[in-house]
Structure formats: C-alpha cells, structure tokens
Amino acid sequence: MIQYPRYRQHRFSSFQVIIAGFAAVGLVGALLLMLPIATQQRCVTPFHEALFTSTSALCVTGLVVQDTGSYWSAFGQSVILLLIQIGGLGVITVGAAFALLSGRKISLKQRSTMQEATAAPQMGGIVRLTGFILRITALFELAGAALLLPTFCADYGLRGIWYALFHSISAFCNAGFDLLGTEGAKFVSLTRYAGDPLLTTVIAALIVFGGLGFLTWEDIYTYRLDFHRYRMQSKVILVTTAFLLVLPTLYFYCFEFTAGSAQQRILLSMFQSVTPRTAGFNTADLAAMGSTSQALMVVLMLLGGSPGSTAGGMKTTTFAVLLANMWATFRRREDAEFFGRRIDGSAVKNAATIAGMYLTLFFLGAFVIATAEQLPMSVCLYETASAVATVGLTLGITPQLGVLSQGVLIALMFLGRVGGLTLIYAAFGSSPAHSRLPQEKIAIG
C-alpha cells in the first residue's frame, strides 16, 4: 500500500495576520481609488499613485502625490477617510468590532491577534478593551468635529460639516490628510488657519490624544487623576510626551518663530512641536524653517507617538527605555528603572532593536531617493523620516518624485505602520535555541 506524505497545514502567526490584513486593505483601497468616480475629473488614476495614496491613508501618514481636496471626488475622499479610520484603529480591531456587532464569538487565536494588534499586556479582557477603544475613538472624533464645525461652516457652508468630520478623524488618527487645497493653491494644509486659536488647539489636542495610546486612556478613565495608580507604561508615556511637547515648543518660540504677536508665536510653536509626532498637518511653511528646526522635527518624527495608539514612529517608550538604560549604564547599575520599578531586560533589547531598524530604514531610504532623484540628502532624510514614522510632513518634494522613489516611500510607510517588532517576528518567527553557545566578551565603545 502506497503511503502519501502528509503535508502539515501552515498556520499563520498573529504578526503575519496583522501584516497580511494591512496589505489586503491597502490593495483594495488602491483599486477603489483607481476608479474614475474617485476623482473630480472622472479620470483613471495610475496604479502607483492610487497605491501611494491608499498606503498613506491606511498607514495614517499623510504624504500625498495629489492634492486631496482638489483632485479626489467625494467618493475618493470617503475612501481615503475610511482607510484612515481603519488604519488608525488597526485592521484587526476593526475586524473584531464587526465580529462583536454580528454576535460572533471571538476565538482564542483571534484574541491573541487582537492582543498583539492593540499592544495589550495580556489576553484577558481583550474584548472589553476593544469595546473601550471603539467608544473612546468615537467620543474624541465626534467631539472634535463638533468643535471644528463653527469654523468650517463659516467658511464653507454646509460642506463644513464634512470638513469638520474629515479633519477631526484625520487629526485623531494622526493622519494629516486635509481638504483645504484648491486648484489655485494645492498642498496648503492648515496654513490659512495658523492664527486661529480654536482650530489649531482642537487639532493639536486630537493629535496628542490619539498618540497617547488606548491603554493610557484606559488608565485615565479608570483612575482619573490618581497618577500613582497608573501602570508604569502609562506613566512613562505621559511624562515623555510632556517632555517632547514642552521643550520643542520653547525652542521654536525662542529661535524659529520670532516675528508676530506673542499669541501667533505660541500657536505656531505649539503646533509645530505637536504635529511631527506623528500627524502631518502644518500651519507654517516648513521649507522656510531653519535647518536646525528642520533637524529637530526629523528627530521628533522618528520618536513618534506611543504604543497601542494611532501614531507611528519608534514610540515614546522606546526612547524612554533607551534613556533609562543609558542612565543606568552611567551609574553602573545592572537594571534600568522607572518609577520604582525595574525594566524587563527584553524590553531594553527590543528598544535597541527597534531603534536600530528604524534608523537603518531611515538612512537607507534617504540614500536611495537622493541617488535616484539627485536631491540634497537633507531633504531626502526629512522625507524618509516622515514616511517611516508615518508622519506626513514634507518639504514639498513628494509630488515630484519618480515611481522608484514613491515605491521606497510606500514600503517605508507600510513598515513604519505595522511596527518594528511585528515585522521582525512575522519575518523570522520564533526559534528558541536548544543550547547556549560559549560566552566571550567583546569591547564596546
């Protein structure tokens, strides 16, 4: 009797499911944006431009090759907004929400994937956390739209309702897409509202709130202002976020925006310190800013928001853990510490890995674009930082880039959104060593 070999069914890991989900939604979005109905001129958008826009929206980046307000129709803008919302919440979270609404039970495998997608510390209570994420997102986005409504309705009439909702979702999801461009003035972002205290403050607040992370908001909701009861991660996020908001604001106020009234300078300084982490709106001419300010914005872009949030970048916790580990090394301590707690050694190793991966992609992408487009390296570094950290700020070169350079940015945006560890674990899986090799010291520094 002939026995045929049995082929073991391949099981996708949670990390591979997350990546496949983002890729599938991005491709569907690109196909929808290619339809003639998606543009105001009823023309077919080239695939690479549609894919670039779809990836930018899904990865909540904001880099565009066509002006969103003047090129895309109401249908196209709706597709972009849907992609932004899916990307902000996460493909897995949105899928879980539909499953919950339909009354289906969430399997153990699905709960594990949801845990990885939301950066939750444990699998228990993950369904409840998903419900909280949906509620808090709806609350902030609707409240933001209501606050933006008077300004946009005053300028655009009934269209202002759509503008308020679009920009509120775009801000909370840290996407940076705007509808304010026209045929005569494209890619203007929020520059016309630079002196509007209400609009700039609301947009900035939505960006910060979206970038804090849903676990942080769960702590705030549960314990209110009792900071000592927050989990260590939430404490680190809040302190690091405050640090990364206040110091750049002071720098911009003192050295960059030195003209105009005190109110104008404060608004400009505050907004330009918020938006690099990682929203993509701007109220100032970024290309006209000094080289030192542009370099500071590159650093802020790479650091990004917080884990389990709508923001991208290396994440505030990565930055904080590296600083804590450096401080521990200076003091010749074995462990890095925060708020009376030791940081797990694997967290330090992961932080170093993520930082190394982001910096490698950042420099490699800039090198390829600078070579292909014959552009200054400083401009390309700004562009690749914006892409890999899913920010969306640009010095104006994005629409002029060739297909190769657009492909590089698409890859950087995708890799930046799915996350460093997700990509690593999906690519290499887990293969624990059965034995340990002999150890030998190596000189460092």
Where are each of the predicted segments found?
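Membrane-proximal intracellular helices of multi-pass ion channels
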Residues: 1-445
